[in-house]
């Protein structure tokens, strides 16, 4: 997923809006049979980019979806990614009040893969 890698570079450079576009393009180009863990990683990174870009409600939904997917697959967030995740969660939780965050998180946890992709590309 070249676009996912480009998104990661943009995010690390502080170019959140550009990272969002790369991740959305990567999701739009998914094909049947793509690796579920790789797809989950793109959602995770897109959530971080959205949080950095100030799109907190959408970020909360996608981070919740990614967390549920990781849990379902038995995958733990790698230590190298934890600081990025915590930073995104701090931004999201700081921007949304508790009812907004709770609602967005519940929506994300309830998404299926198709709904998450559609919501990510169109949000």
What are these regions (language model features)?
Residues 2, 19-26, 59-69:
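Tetratricopeptide repeat
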Residues 13-14, 28-38, 71-79:
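Short coil/turn linkers that connect adjacent helices within long alpha-helical scaffolds
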